[in-house]
Amino acid sequence: GYQRGRYGAEDLRALDGWAAALGIELIPCIQTLGHLERFLHWESSAPLRDTPDVLLAGDEETYRLIEAMLRRCRACYRTKKIHLGMDEAMNLGLGGYLKKNGYHESFDIMLRHVERVGALARKHGFEPMMWSDMYFRCASPNDDYYEDDIEIPQTVIDAAPADMTLVYWDYYHDDEAFYDRYIRLHQKFAAPLRFAGGMWTWLGPAVDYDVFFKKAEPALRACLGNGVTDVMITTWGDDGGETSPQAMLLGLQAW
């Protein structure tokens, strides 16, 4: 944001070193498809733009950009893990891609993109993971992630690569049965599963702990009940990142 700093390569290497000294594995989380509106709104990025926030999949310039991201991450982090994002890429293939290539099913575009980006990540020594929602949205008539009666077609399950960990993110439900059902849906895929909850740090200067605990407790019970031991907590900084990291300590302990 405005007048906010950013970490350079030396800063990231220093953070990685301090984390390692404390027994913490620092893992980069980047975006390689959607959520790139702040980058894509510049005119210089126009050749890489499908829609205002989604990269132009299938274009070689896009993959040169992504490989540059991966090279930078490889130079700054000692971990083998990387999170490639790829969530909420709605309207994929309906902007610049449509003009350039004609109409293609968004799911087919995504599958080719996932395969290409995953190969690039592995080329640079990473074990990749991605958010899972786009696989669910393709099975939804409303392009939604969360639906009570959704069933994932076997063709979708079979098409997802087995060597790309799927991260089921859910910050919103307070019903253990819902988490239980969605974990079981994710477990139909061959890929390893990780769960990501949310600490509700994105509403202002304070963590909404009332909401957080109502969501976290049933989510973690469902994870334990279904053998999901790889879990993470997100602390997004939407709308200015006003929440102090010190205010998050209770949530980190609870998780």
Task: Map each language-model feature to its residues.
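Glycine-rich, aromatic-flanked loop segments that form ligand/cofactor-binding clefts
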Residues: 18-43, 78-83
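Glycine-rich tight-turn/loop motif centered on a GG-T
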Residues: 2-11, 46-60, 96-108, 164-167
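Catalytic core of soluble alpha/beta enzymes
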Residues: 32, 36-60, 90, 150
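Aromatic-lined carbohydrate-binding/catalytic grooves of carbohydrate-active enzymes
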Residues: 1-11, 34-37, 41-47, 194-196, ...
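Short, solvent-exposed turn/loop segments enriched in Gly/Ser/Thr/Pro and often Arg
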Residues: 30-36, 85-89, 134, 235-238
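Active-site/ligand-binding-proximal alpha/beta "capping" segment
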Residues: 75-82, 86, 93
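Short, solvent-exposed loop/turn and secondary-structure capping segments
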Residues: 37-41, 95, 141, 178-179
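Substrate-binding groove of N-acetylhexosamine-processing glycoside hydrolases
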Residues: 14-17, 23, 63-75, 79-80, ...
